[in-house]
Amino acid sequence: MTAATQFDQVSIIKRANVYFDGKCVSHTVVFPDGSRKTLGVILPGALNFGTDAAELMEVQAGQCRIRLEGSEDWKTYGAGESFSVPGNSRFDIDVVETLDYVCSYL
């Protein structure tokens, strides 16, 4: 079984979500059932993100290291891998190679 390479029958919010002075840029995709995902790119560097809802981050290309709030351990993720972040939390991300990602809100 292969992963889907596109999303069909969706709406895209035209205005970009721009964070950290342009180091992270994404667009919101709205599905027919009202659920949302963001598709984005994070440039190399170290950032700290906060979450409202739980998230599943799927790495499409690039490489990063992640440290979840309350942990001292860093984990490395690359293309084809994913990681989960709890809701109402924070995580550190160290982008080693420009990151292309899909974020699903759980």
Curated annotation (Swiss-Prot):
First-tier enzyme category under EC: transferase
GO cellular component: a single term: cytosol
HAMAP family: Nucleos_phosphorylase_PpnP
Keywords assigned: Glycosyltransferase, Transferase
Pfam families cross-referenced by the UniProt entry: Ppnp
Record family assignment: Belongs to the nucleoside phosphorylase PpnP family.
UniProt name for this protein: Pyrimidine/purine nucleoside phosphorylase
Gene name tied to this protein: ppnP
Catalytic activity: a purine D-ribonucleoside + phosphate = a purine nucleobase + alpha-D-ribose 1-phosphate; adenosine + phosphate = alpha-D-ribose 1-phosphate + adenine; cytidine + phosphate = cytosine + alpha-D-ribose 1-phosphate; guanosine + phosphate = alpha-D-ribose 1-phosphate + guanine
A molecular function GO annotation: purine-nucleoside phosphorylase activity
Nucleus keyword on record: no
EC numbers for this chain: 2.4.2.1, 2.4.2.2
Cited function: Catalyzes the phosphorolysis of diverse nucleosides, yielding D-ribose 1-phosphate and the respective free bases. Can use uridine, adenosine, guanosine, cytidine, thymidine, inosine and xanthosine as substrates. Also catalyzes the reverse reactions.
